[in-house]
Swiss-Prot record:
InterPro entries: Glyco_trans_51, Lysozyme-like_dom_sf, PBP_transglycosylase, Pep_trsgly. This is Biosynthetic peptidoglycan transglycosylase. The gene is mtgA. Peptidoglycan polymerase that catalyzes glycan chain elongation from lipid-linked precursors. Pathway: Cell wall biogenesis; peptidoglycan biosynthesis. It catalyses: [GlcNAc-(1->4)-Mur2Ac(oyl-L-Ala-gamma-D-Glu-L-Lys-D-Ala-D-Ala)](n)-di-trans,octa-cis-undecaprenyl diphosphate + beta-D-GlcNAc-(1->4)-Mur2Ac(oyl-L-Ala-gamma-D-Glu-L-Lys-D-Ala-D-Ala)-di-trans,octa-cis-undecaprenyl diphosphate = [GlcNAc-(1->4)-Mur2Ac(oyl-L-Ala-gamma-D-Glu-L-Lys-D-Ala-D-Ala)](n+1)-di-trans,octa-cis-undecaprenyl diphosphate + di-trans,octa-cis-undecaprenyl diphosphate + H(+). SUPFAM superfamilies: Lysozyme-like. The lineage of its organism: Bacteria, Pseudomonadati, Pseudomonadota, Betaproteobacteria, Burkholderiales. It comes from the Bacteria. It comes from Paraburkholderia phymatum (strain DSM 17167 / CIP 108236 / LMG 21445 / STM815).
Amino acid sequence: MATTMTKGRRAKGQAVSPARWAMYAGAVFVVAWIATQLFYFAQIAVWNYVNPQSTAFMRSDAWRLSQDRPDQSLQHVWVPYEQISRNLKRAIIASEDANFVNNNGYETDAILQAWERNKARGKIVAGGSTITQQLARNLFLSREKSYIRKGQELIITWMLETLMDKERIFEIYLNSVEWGNGVYGAEAAARYYFRTSAAKLTAGQSARLAVMLPRPKYFDEHRSSGYLTQRARVIARRMGAAELPE
């Protein structure tokens, strides 16, 4: 009996094997990952009917401004889709995602081209992102460039395309995309750069705003950039062919 009790105590005192710990850790990771995806899915479903109050990018910028520029606050005003100039809508589609209305949120050729450029450079320098992919990143993710983040971006893109129509995706994009240092959304950008409303933006103004999107903070500080002016002319010529979601 004494021998049996000794064996029992030894068994209780034995450490859990590394393989079992790995299994436990893997199970916790899978559960956490699934819970995160369900949260994203539910949040997107709600945003079909309720406008997002903020995005991951906005919250990050608001915190940065509170630390670096406490006298400056985030500029953001939501306006309905119908109150945003068709000029701006056409300019953004012409500049960022010419096939927005007809694609499923992905442009395979652009993704493959970005992959080749990244492989050649040995780091992520391009993402081949559509408007829906950009929105996925803005809403939930960070500015970090990694393959893990890109994978999550693609999953959220699928959720957006599954749960929302193109007009709603574009409406949220127009109201949440970054346009400068602490400037978010079409209405805030129109007021900040041109002292007008998003509804009254001209073709020229819209083309400039569209060109700023890939590097909004840079162009906020370099508004007289020759590239900005030249590229805006190109986008202005392409705007007429841009197809809008209706």
